[in-house]
Amino acid sequence: MKSIDYVNPVKNQVPKVGFVSLGCPKALVDSERILTQLRVEGYDIVPSYDAADVVVVNTCGFIDSAVTESLDAIGEAMNANGKVIVTGCLGKRPEQIREAYPQVLAVSGPQDYQSVMEAVHAALPPRHDPFVDLVPDYGIKLTPRHYAYLKISEGCNHRCSFCIIPSMRGDLVSRPVDEVLCEAERLVRGGVKELLVVSQDTSAYGVDLKYAERPWRDRMYQTRMKALCEGLSELGVWTRLHYVYPYPHVDDVLPLMAEGKLLPYLDIPFQHASPRILKLMKRPGAVEKTLQRVQRWKAMCPEITVRSTFIVGFPGETDAEFESLLDFLDQAQLDRVGAFAYSPVHGASANALPDPVPEEVKQERLARFMAKQAEISALRLEAKIGSVQQCLVDLIEDDIAVARSRADAPEIDGLVHIQNGGELGLKVGDLVDVEITDSDEHDLFGDALPANVVPQQGRALNLQMV
C-alpha cells in the first residue's frame, strides 16, 4: 500500500516571523506580549532567519555595549533576511538605527506594541489560522514554564545622572493592581511557581494613579506595592521583588516576608556609599540611614536576602570615596552584589561631570570591589551549611539537579547543586527541600530530602526563538 504524506495547506500559508529579544527582564516581557499578539493573529514564530518572512528585533539601548549588541543584531538580521522591524529602547533613537541600516522596514520605541503589529501587518498581512486557540490564556512566555516576570509599571520618575531610562521609557505609568493580579493568576494557572516582580521603580508603584483601589477576588486592593504583595501572596507561589528603590515604606513589606507570604528577598540598587558621589548621581545620600535600615530589615526578617548593585569609577570618585565603598560592604554584609565600572551613556547628564576616572583605575577598583564581596559572599554561604533550604529546580544536568533557593533570582544570583537529583528523579519545576552540605563563593551544594518534593504539574509550552 502506497503511503501518502499529508500536507496541511493552511499551515503552509501561515506567515512566519523571526524574533530577537535583547535587554533586561522588562524588555523580555515586552517581547512576550508582542509574540502573544502575533500568535493570536495567526503568525507562526520560527527559530531561524531563513525560515522567517520578516524579523522583529527588540533592542536595548541602556549602555554603550547594549547599543553595540543591538546594532549588531539588527545587522545580522538584515544580512540573513533583509526584512527587519526594530523596536525597543534603541528605537527611541531612530536616526542612529537608520544611519547604520537605512533599509529597516520600521522603527518604534519600547512598549509600542501597536506600532510593531502595524509594521508586521504592512510587511506580512495576517491570515486565518484555525489553531490560534491553542495559545494559552497566559500568553507566550520566553522564560521556562516554572517562573515568569511580572511587569507592574513602565518608566521612571527619577532622573539619576547616569541613567537614560526616562528618556527611553518615559515617566512612571503603573498598571492597575487588578490587571496585574489577574495576569499573575493566569500565569499560576499555567504552571508558574515563581513570580518575579519587575519595573523601573517597584517601590513607586501606583503613585501616578494616586494609589487607586480596584477589586480583585471579592475585596478592594490599593494600587500600591504592599497591597500588590498582599494580593500576590494569595496565589501560593514564590513572589520575588526586583528594582526596589530605597524608600522608607519598603519596610512595610517586611512583615509579609517574615510571615512567609513573600520571598524574603530585596533587590535594592544602592549604587554607592559616598554621600558626595550619590549626590552627583542624583541618588539618596543618607548612607548611615541606609546601613541602619539594612540592619533593621535583618532584625525584622532574619532570613532576608539583600541584593544590590553598585557603580565604581564614577566621575570624580576619589581613592578615599572608593575605600568608603569597601567599608560599606564590610558593614552592610549584603548577600548578593553586582557591580560595573562606570562608562558614559549617550544622553546621560553624568557625561558632563568633571574628573573622569582613568579606565585602568576603574578596572582595578572593580576587581578589588568584587574580590571584597566574594569574601563576604563565601562566608555568608558557608553559614548555610547544615541548614535545609527550599529550592526550585531549573535544570537537570547528568545526575545533578541545578536549582535555586529562595535567596537566588534566576540568572543573576547563585545556584544550588542537588547531588542526588538524578537518583530521586527530580524534574524542572519541582520544589524540594535540600540539606546543604557544602558551599563556595557563589553556590551551594546539597542533597534533596525525598519526602519533601512538590512536583511540577502539566506540560510546558516549548518555544524556541532566534
Curated annotation (Swiss-Prot):
Q: What is its EC number?
A: 2.8.4.4
Q: Where located?
A: Cytoplasm
CDD domains on file? Radical_SAM (cd01335)
Could you list this entry's UniProt keywords, alphabetically sorted.
4Fe-4S, Cytoplasm, Iron, Iron-sulfur, Metal-binding, S-adenosyl-L-methionine, Transferase
Q: Which residues does the record give as [4Fe-4S] cluster 2 binding sites?
A: C156, C160, C163
Entry GO terms, CC: cytosol
- Enzyme class label: transferase
Q: Taxonomically, which superkingdom?
A: Bacteria
Does Coiled coil count among this protein's keywords? Answer: no
Q: Name one GO biological process term.
A: tRNA modification
Residues given in the record as [4Fe-4S] cluster 1 binding sites: C24, C60, C89
Q: What's noted on cofactor binding?
A: Binds 2 [4Fe-4S] clusters. One cluster is coordinated with 3 cysteines and an exchangeable S-adenosyl-L-methionine.
Q: Name one Pfam family in it.
A: UPF0004
- Domain TRAM stretches: 382-450
- List residues of the MTTase N-terminal domain: 15-125
What does the UniProt function comment say about this protein?
Catalyzes the methylthiolation of an aspartic acid residue of ribosomal protein uS12.
Q: Which family does it belong to?
A: Belongs to the methylthiotransferase family. RimO subfamily.
Name used for this protein in its record = Ribosomal protein uS12 methylthiotransferase RimO
What is the native source organism of this protein? Xanthomonas oryzae pv. oryzae (strain KACC10331 / KXO85)
The UniProt gene name for this protein comes to rimO
